[in-house]
Amino acid sequence: PVIVLSARGREQDKVAALDGGADDYLTKPFSFGELTARVRVALRRSLRTAPPTVPTLETGGLKIDFEARQVFVNGQEIRLTPLEYKVLAFLARHAGKVITHKQLLAEVWGPAYEDSTHTLRVHMGAIRQKLEPEPARPRYIRTETGVGYRFLLEEGV
C-alpha cells in the first residue's frame, strides 16, 4: 500500500497522486493516531485483495494442498491442528509479504485476540517443529522481529 503524506491540499494534487497509484492521501497537519488508523486500513485492504488462490503451493520439500487442506514435507503428510493449518495457509497465501502479529491473530483467532502474541508464538513453534528440518533455523517461515512473520519461497519457485 502507498499512502501519500503531503503539505499540498489542492484537489488536483490529491487526484494526481491517487491516479498515479497511491492508495490514500493525507494532508498535513495530521495526528499520529489518524496516520496509524489509515495504515491499518490500507493493510486490511491489501490482505483482502489476496493473490489468486492456487490449488497447491510447493517450495523446497514443502507442499501445501489448499483444496484438500493437507501439508506434506518431502512427500510425507504432516498432521497439523486446524489452527496450525489456518496460520500456515494464511502465511503461504501471502508468501513473501510480512504479516503482522495483529493481522495473523485477527485472521485466525478473531479481532478479540489481536494482542495474544504469546498464543501465536506457541503455535508457530509447534508448526516449525512439524515442518522445519531445523526449527531453530527456519526455511519456510521467517520471524520479522517485533513485527510478525513472512512465508519464504525458495528461489525459482
Model-derived features: where do they sit?
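Short helix-capping/turn signature of helix-turn-helix
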Residues: 93-95, 111, 147
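Flexible coil/turn residues that form the inter-helical turn or adjacent wing/linker of helix-turn-helix
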Residues: 28, 97, 113
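Basic, amphipathic DNA-recognition helix from helix-turn-helix-like DNA-binding domains
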Residues: 1-58
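Short, Lys/Arg-enriched segments at the junction into DNA-binding effector domains
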Residues: 41-98, 102
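C-terminal end segment of the histidine kinase catalytic
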Residues: 50, 153-157
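Short coil-to-helix segment of the ABC ATPase nucleotide-binding domain corresponding to the Q-loop/switch region
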Residues: 33, 97-108
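DNA-recognition element of transcription regulators
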Residues: 31-44, 79-89, 101, 114-134, ...
